[in-house]
UniProtKB/Swiss-Prot annotation:
It is a single-pass type I membrane protein. This is G-type lectin S-receptor-like serine/threonine-protein kinase B120. The lineage of its organism: Eukaryota, Viridiplantae, Streptophyta, Embryophyta, Tracheophyta. The modification Phosphoserine is found at S563, S658, S671, S732, S837. Its main location: membrane.
């Protein structure tokens, strides 16, 4: 028995090492070995099975090619082809290392159809080996030195892979270009190529045919390509490109791309139809999805508006115009471009006047610049251009330096945001005319503002004198009010803690459990409502910071006479928030009503509102994922208290990021209950003819039909959740193809790319599991049907539990946040009213209190 056990052990070890050696050898071919096509053909496989190299036939073709493709996924996209111009007609191909040390591909007649074509520096080529790596690189090297002799990365076809080095030599003009396939099923060299232009500042160029430019990326500034304005938004597209510096011994520099997440499978490809795409593998959908493509619009087409013309994407079509100081050469024919109206001083040979510069902002800089890297001062750059009569424009870009344009300005494009500033050289009369017009407009506006300001100041002083004259306790005869001056002592305050009735425009409001402040006390606390104490303005009116005599900091919301909100909202806050006590709801300390003054007094929030941090690029990093998730949980608990656990069942109806305040410890506090409604114990839904809320946060049934319920708040919470995770406003994408943040989130969710929605500032450090769960929950909350949305108890459970099962959400269709589209679609009778606040115009709560 012992003999058999030993024999079995030895046999197992032998088989293990044999299989191990076989698997290790599966990615290499040594001298004397070969890879053969045919029925029993087995491709070479990289160590982690990421890539394979072997023979294939594209589509329905019978031609055979040697290529590299992805190995461990269903869609085995081909990324490199050896014999793309010389296919083999049958399955007789053989890959081997020849006697001269070259890697060769032979057909059935032993004819070389492809070779690595290198000159051997040694007579002993027996130590050469070729292997496929997990990067997709096919490398011929020597076993004793492991030095690459030849590699496929230096001879690309149509695909740029991560870690591939794209060589460009500004001195010799050499560059490695990626050439498209001829068709979808024909790998032979096509009509389009993509590469780095070796002249000027490095930029990626897409050529058609014999080097006719079709698209370019704009100059590389060591961080982004300046002609791709959304590059800073596409984080995974941006953070990975690098340009080696300084040049190597041959004068070459190299572009590389290393993604922030190495586990993501991605590739850049130039297609046979003349577009460049970045494709990513979607494991959920089991397919490649397009992440970005160029050219992406009409204005991206190279030099669409001709020389000295500029293209602007207004609406869906690109609109051409001449830059200021130029006129069309041939009206209606933009291919001929524009020409200068007034010659420059040096062209007229006169000594009177001086050429000036007109600045164009947020533009794609023209092509064919002359870099002056040693000039980094704006004045030096300007002077360099002025001294050269051929200079038409200059620009100073961080990471590049000064750039001069001595030729025609071509391929100009106007962006909504991003881009660079270009200084156009014009005759003094052209700039002077433009400057005079601007000065006239500015002077007119300033005079108007000053006159309005003087009038407003006089009116305010008159009104303040009138108000303060009767602003002490019990002296106002127009109202029936009992007021306590709470700045004196706690004893005085407690004496008025019982039920106090005040009359507001003939309507009795019971302030049970809510102290009432005198106007005098608040005026002292806020230093007579001085401008320095103003924290902000909302739909209600201005909000002031104050300090009571006992040292407590307060925030005073003062109802403005021109407020979009009025007495009903004022009453609502008094009635509702005074009865609510929860750590995630803002605390109302009291109110004041004297004469025409109506004020609410809150606890002061030193960290202002959530949007103060969330939408400010300089402050986004201060709220990391741990803090954001804590804020999300706090808001959810506050809503659950309102919907289920408070003495009153309350629907907020205006939940948004600016109505979430942050205390000293960054705990979230839901605020602004002016639009809230009380629900009965068994009431599930109500209808209103007075639709209130904020565009982008209103649920479909509420905005369209006036129906509201606790599920209306759930919808708003879903939008808020997407904003917190992404760091984007819900209205920030309304001009994009997705129409809204909800539409963009749904697109990423269905394509298995939800992690791309996460704020780039926290994407690397956040809990991916929690972030994806938050996005999934948000998608459930913003479903069109209120019945299909979860309640807040379920939402909180899904957020806090790793084991909770999350249902598949239905596609939301009500995703547009455009004001005009919502107005058009309101299907309500003429008696219905709309009270709508907007994050872009005003906020119903201040930035801080």
């Amino acid at each position: 028995m012992r003999f058999f056990r030993k024999t079995s052990l030895y046999l197992s070890l032998f088989l293990y090492f044999f299989l191990y050696e076989s698997s290790m050898a599966a990615n290499t071919i040594r001298r004397g070995e070969s890879l053969r096509d045919g029925i029993n053909h087995k491709p070479l496989v990289s160590p982690q099975k990421t890539f394979e190299l072997g023979f294939f036939s594209p589509g329905s073709s019978t031609h055979r090619f040697l290529g590299i493709w992805y190995g461990n996924i269903e869609d085995k996209a081909v990324v490199w082809v050896a014999n793309r111009a010389t296919p083999i007609s049958d399955q007789s191909g053989v890959l081997m290392i020849s006697n001269d040390g070259n890697l060769v591909l032979l057909d059935g007649k032993n004819i070389t159809v492809w070779s690595s074509n290198i000159e051997s520096s040694t007579t002993n080529n027996n130590n050469r080996v070729v292997s496929i790596h997990d990067t997709g690189n096919f490398v011929l090297s020597e076993t004793d030195t492991d030095r690459p002799i030849w590699e496929s990365f230096n001879h690309p076809t149509d695909t740029f892979l991560p870690q591939m080095r794209v060589r460009v030599n500004p001195q010799t003009g050499d560059n490695h270009a990626f050439v498209s396939w001829r068709s979808e099923t024909d790998p032979s060299p096509g009509n389009y190529s993509l590469g780095v232009d070796p002249s000027g500042a490095p930029e990626i160029v897409l050529w058609e045919g014999n080097k006719t430019r079709k698209w370019r990326s704009g100059q590389w500034n060591s961080a982004i390509f300046t002609g791709i304005p959304n590059m800073s938004l596409l984080t995974n597209y941006l953070y990975g490109f690098k340009l080696s510096s300084p040049p190597d011994e041959t004068g070459s520099v190299y572009f590389t791309y290393v993604p922030s997440d190495p586990s993501v499978l991605l590739r850049f490809k130039v297609l046979y139809n003349g577009t460049e795409e970045e494709l990513r593998w979607n494991e959920t959908l089991k397919k490649w999805t397009k992440f970005q493509s160029e050219p992406d619009s009409e204005c991206d087409q190279y030099n669409r508006c001709g020389k000295f013309g500029i293209c602007d994407m207004k609406g869906s079509n690109g609109i051409c115009s001449c830059i200021h100081g130029y006129e069309q050469v041939s009206v209606g024919n933009w291919s001929r471009g524009c020409r200068r109206r007034t010659p420059l001083k040096c062209e007229r040979n006169i000594s009177v006047g001086e050429d000036e510069f007109l600045t164009l902002k947020s533009v794609k800089l023209p092509d064919f610049e002359i870099p002056e890297h040693n000039l980094v001062d704006p004045e030096d750059c300007r002077e360099r251009c002025l001294r050269n009569c051929s200079c038409n424009a200059y620009s100073l870009v961080g990471g590049i330096g000064c750039m001069i344009w001595n030729q025609d300005l071509v391929d100009l494009q106007q962006f909504e945001a991003g881009g660079s500033s270009l200084h156009i050289r014009l005759a003094d009369s052209e700039v002077g005319e433009n400057r005079k017009t601007k000065i006239a407009v500015i002077v007119a506006v300033l005079v108007g503002v000053i006159l309005i300001g003087i009038f407003a100041l006089l009116l305010w002083r008159f009104k303040r004198k009138k108000d303060v004259s009767g602003a002490y306790c019990g002296k106002n005869t127009d109202t029936s009010v009992v007021v306590a001056d709470l700045t004196k002592s706690k004893e005085t305050t407690s004496a008025f803690s019982g039920s106090v009735d005040i009359m507001i425009e003939g309507k009795a409001v019971n302030t049970s459990e809510l102290p009432v402040f005198s106007l005098n006390a608040i005026a002292i606390a806020t230093n007579d409502f001085c401008k320095e104490n103003e924290l902000g303005r909302g739909g209600f009116g201005p909000v002031y910071k104050g300090v009571l005599e006992d040292g407590r900091e307060i925030a005073v919301k003062r109802l403005s006479g021109k407020s979009g909100q009025g007495v009903d909202e004022f009453k609502n806050e008094i009635i509702l928030i005074a009865k609510l006590q929860h750590r995630n709801l803002v605390r109302l300390l009291g109110c004041c009503f004297e004469g025409e003054e109506k004020m609410l007094v809150y606890e002061y929030m030193p960290n202002k509102s959530l949007d103060f941090f969330l939408f400010d690029e300089t402050k986004q990093a201060l709220i990391d994922w741990k803090l954001r998730f804590s804020i999300i949980e706090g808001i959810a608990r506050g809503l659950l208290y309102l919907h289920r656990d408070s003495r009153l069942r309350i629907i907020h109806r205006d939940l948004k990021v600016s109505n979430v305040l942050l205390d000293a410890e960054m705990n979230p506090k839901i605020s602004d209950f002016g639009m809230a409604r009380i629900f009965g114990g068994n009431q599930n839904e109500a209808n209103t003819v007075r639709v209130v809320g904020t565009y982008g946060y209103m649920s479909p049934e509420y905005a369209m039909e006036g129906l509201f319920s606790v599920k209306s708040d759930v919808y708003s919470f879903g939008v808020l959740l997407l904003e917190i995770v992404s760091g984007k406003r819900n209205t920030s994408l309304r001009s994009s193809e997705h129409g809204s943040l909800i539409g963009y989130a749904w697109y990423l969710y269905t394509h298995g790319r939800s992690e791309e929605l996460v704020d780039p500032k926290i994407r690397v450090t956040c809990s991916k599991r929690e972030a994806l769960r938050c996005i999934h929950v948000a998608m459930l909350c913003v479903q069109d049907s209120a019945a299909e949305r979860p309640n807040m108890a379920s939402v909180l459970l899904m957020l806090e539990s790793d084991t909770a099962t999350l249902a598949a959400p239905r596609q939301p269709t009500f995703t547009s946040t455009r004001r005009n589209s919502i107005d058009v679609n309101f299907a309500l009778d003429s008696s219905q009213q709309y009270i709508v606040s907007s994050n872009e115009i005003t906020s119903t709560v201040v930035l801080g209190r």
